[in-house]
Structures are given as C-alpha cells and as structure tokens.
Amino acid sequence: MRSKFDEELNLLNDELTEMGDLISVRIIEAVRAFRHKDLIKAKFIMDNDEDVNEYERKIEERALKLLLRQQPVASDLRLISSALKMITDMERIGDHAVDIAEIVMTIPQVTKDETYQKIIVMADTSIEMLKESLKSFVTGDLSLVDNISRHDDRVDGFFDEVREDVVGEIRADTIGAEYAIDILMIAKYLERIGDHAENISEWVEYSITGQHVQK
C-alpha cells in the first residue's frame, strides 16, 4: 500500500516540476516578446494558457486522490496540502505571463535596452526562485530556499529602479504616458511573480518542517 502511495507521490512531484518548467518558459517568452514586440509569440502565450490550467487540474486531482484513497501520515498530509497551495500560486504566475503577453499586443514601441535588462533580471530571478522552491519540495532539502527572501528583495529593488526610470523619462518627455504605463505594468506583473514564488517557498518550508512562516 505504501509503495503505491510513494509511486503516486513521485508522479505528483514530476507534474509539479513539469508545470514549473512550463510557466518558466512562458515568463521568458513573454518578456522576449515584449523586448521585440513579437506579436506572434505573445499571441501563442495567450492562446495556450490552457496548458498551465490543465496541469493545475491534473495535480489537484492526483493530490485529492492521494488524500482519499491512501492513508497518509501527518508528513504526507503536509506534502499534499502544500502541493495544493503551491499550484494556486503557480497558476497565477502563468496568468501573469499572459498579462504581459496581452500588453505586448498593444504596446506602441520596442523598449529601450537599459530598461529591458532590468526587466529580464526580474524575470530570471523570479524563475530561479520558483525552480529552487520546487527542487526543495521534491528533494526535501530546505537549504535550497534559504535565499528566496533575498532574491525577492532583488526583484522588488529592480521594480523600484524601473519605476524611477519611467518617471524620469516622463518628466523629460521622452516617452508617452501610455507606453510608460505599459512598462510599469509589465514590471509590476514580474514583481508579483516574485511574490508568488516566495509564497511557494513558504509552503515548501511548511511541507518539510510543519511550520508556515511568512518571510
């Protein structure tokens, strides 16, 4: 009976990792679409959001079956309940990739390289946070999430820089208001992705230690 449970739990871990890989790719694709005003790529992200939702449904169904059909001990219950919480944040990360893609469809111009470099760092850092959190969940190695809060602070710091840059350009009358709002919204969505990644790390910590501490 236990071997069957462990087999199903491994499948759950595999699906979580696959979902994480998918949304990581979508984030990068959305940011690159923003850089080059790539309408084809942006539309692909928007049209294929159901892929992320399907993973959420699959993982939720597997987790609930584990709860109902098996006899999980307390540590198993923490793992399963944490997975259910994590996929909610992961699905929202996928939604934010779509949000960025939707902005790309109407953005009036290609962004400046300096601003893009800050935005790509925000995206890369958020993806690193997500992947480290999922790896920690699968392996049980809590040390992998030790630096998550520091990474989130880095994302927040770059958001502040992007905002200051945009405000400066508005005052200098070098960009229009509509474009400024688009850039700020993209940066804000990436900041939220970082926040969701930090939430995931908190549920990972709970799954391992039994303590849910907000960072």
Which functions belong to the PLM regions below?
Residues 1-215:
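Cytosolic, long alpha-helical scaffolding segments
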